[in-house]
Amino acid sequence: MSEPIIVVRDLANRFGSHAVHEHLDLDVMKGEILGVVGGSGTGKSVLLRSIIGLRQPSEGSVHVFGQNLPALPPLERSKLERRFGVLFQNGALFSSLTVSENICLPLIEHAGLSRADAQFMAKVKISLAGLPPDAGAKYPAELSGGMVKRAALARALALDPDILFLDEPTAGLDPIGAAAFDPV
């Protein structure tokens, strides 16, 4: 059996005296699809942020691909983080950039693609996320909630990540929009 790609041990996250997680252990294997389910405010997003390195846990360790993310030097950490695709709950798109520009940015910055190659790949990712081709020229404010989620998914897929993290990908969508998102 292969080694886990994510290993969380004895994780604790606290906000003041309020404990969100205590002694949490988690292994995620390559190819595994894992859903973390819980009510509002139960720490699902806090766990995600701890795993991807946006939050330093109060206690415990998080290893991704065998590496302790918080302990890595900045250059190595950045290299490891490029292996993640993250769809944040609110989409987290740059409002001053079009959908295509939001997708092109990591391709140019991190993959070193030319603008033309990045634009081509943005079209591929837009299609893959189930958006119409003309969505690329629109700004996030011009999109419906479901389209924002799909645009954010296209950006999360931009660098062909080894791990894809989805934080409440259908939150705020109507039942039809949520059902349409599932096949993507």
Language-model regions, residue ranges each:
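Conserved ABC ATPase signature
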Residues: 139-143, 147
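The feature captures the beta-strand-to-loop junction immediately N-terminal to the Walker
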Residues: 37-39
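Conserved ABC ATPase "signature" region
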Residues: 67-68, 115-134
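Catalytic Walker B motif of ABC-type/P-loop ATPase nucleotide-binding domains
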Residues: 164-167
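Helix-to-loop junction immediately C-terminal to a conserved catalytic motif
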Residues: 52
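Conserved catalytic motifs of ABC-family nucleotide-binding domains
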Residues: 160
